[in-house]
Amino acid sequence: LLKVLFLENDSLEYIPFISNDPVFPTIEYGMDTKQINDKNQKLIEENKALFFDLVKQKKLSLTVHNESGTLMQQVIEESRFADMMLVKSSMSLSYEDDQNPTSFVKQVLAKAECPVLIMPEDSQTINEIYFTYNGSHSSVFAIKHFSYLFPAFKYLPVTVLYVSEEKNDQEDKQINDIRELLYAQYKHVTVKVLQGTAEAELFSELALKKNVIVTFGAFGRSTISRFFRKSSTNSILQTIDIPAFITHP
């Protein structure tokens, strides 16, 4: 069952107003509630019509919820009863939020009670799977949940990116364990051991990839959260243009 949330943001935008003073013209910002509401309502109705046309073409079964008020709370409550949530990395409740991922998306990642699939702007066919793995409970948790949700992907090639940031006596065992788990579900599995910092190594591996999907084991609860912080190379989600499956125990 596909469930769709239409979220209506109650916050207002600032609109520029130019003064009529011919000598000292100024620009001030104010709120034109009627203009904003009319513009937003028209856009909402147009997007809904496009969406329902697509659903009809694809012959999908779905339920629709129209949500307003405390939107984050509504989203999290809905996630409790969902197998997975799809969110665009650019989704925002504020016209000023130009981060990628946005503040809204970061909150969803940290608070959602189901896996979240962060979608790039343009859809793409998935031809390969990348699992990030460091032996932790959260990384295995993400891999297992992804496999449960996408059984049709079992014939796609899988690459496990194992990042070894420091000497680890359990490395061989951890690699053998993940191989054993994945060989039972996938036909083509490769484990690639990366040496160095997780951010740099994963960025190097994923930066130029297309038509792939990647899993991360946590957000805000382990070193995985570092990938989404601003840095000299920007956040990994801003730089890589591929779907990212993110969840935490």
Residue ranges and their predicted role:
Residues I27-L43:
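A short acidic, glycine-rich active-site loop
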